[in-house]
């Protein structure tokens, strides 16, 4: 199973904004296995998609490019907001706390009744650039006590949530993961 590595394309451009966009657009995914004929097996959610070259998995945001799996939604927030922790709904964990809620495109379900269908099923993998360090800064600037990875399925934006959560923890913020739970044991143990 491959471990995660950041794409080094930033060195190829002098324009920082373009460089940041390239890095965010081609972030190597966590938890995948190389297969025969250039295919990769995504080991993040329980679907364990077998993805052909130049194709995406069921979630539409994990793409095989030449035998490397990329998270197309890394650092691209489709929804950001300050919420009370009770909205997550967590009533006994840090009652009264405010959290910075962050979502990126993609989901491993297709629930017809989903409140967030428009952002979770976005085929364009839209969103504004909102790198992990900016997520933490925005949370601190908004007097939030934590960050919640929510609205869409955070398992599908694991790399983004993982990097943000590490920085948040270092900054003294707590993290919550509002998930459908359809992930692999490897995802639960990811480091």
Region locations from a protein language model:
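Flexible, acidic/Gly-rich N-terminal and inter-domain linker regions that tether
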Residues: 6-97
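Conserved Radical SAM active-site core
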Residues: 64-191
């Amino acid at each position: 199973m491959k471990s995660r590595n950041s794409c080094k394309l930033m060195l190829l451009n002098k324009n920082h904004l373009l460089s940041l966009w390239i890095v965010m657009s081609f972030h190597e995914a966590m938890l995948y296995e190389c297969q025969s004929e250039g295919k990769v097996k995504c080991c993040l959610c329980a679907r364990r998609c077998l993805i052909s070259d130049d194709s995406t998995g069921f979630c539409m945001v994990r793409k095989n490019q030449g035998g490397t799996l990329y998270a197309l939604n890394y650092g691209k927030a489709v929804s950001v907001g300050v919420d009370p922790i009770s909205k997550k709904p967590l009533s006994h964990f840090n009652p009264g706390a405010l959290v910075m809620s962050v979502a990126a495109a993609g989901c491993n379900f297709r629930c017809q009744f989903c409140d967030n269908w428009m952002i979770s099923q976005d085929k364009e993998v839209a969103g504004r650039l909102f790198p992990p360090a900016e997520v933490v800064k925005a949370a601190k600037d908004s007097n939030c006590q934590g960050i919640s990875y929510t609205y869409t399925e955070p398992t599908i934006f694991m790399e983004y949530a993982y990097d943000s959560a590490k920085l948040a923890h270092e900054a003294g913020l707590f993290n919550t993961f509002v998930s459908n739970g359809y992930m692999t044991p490897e995802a639960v143990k990811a480091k």
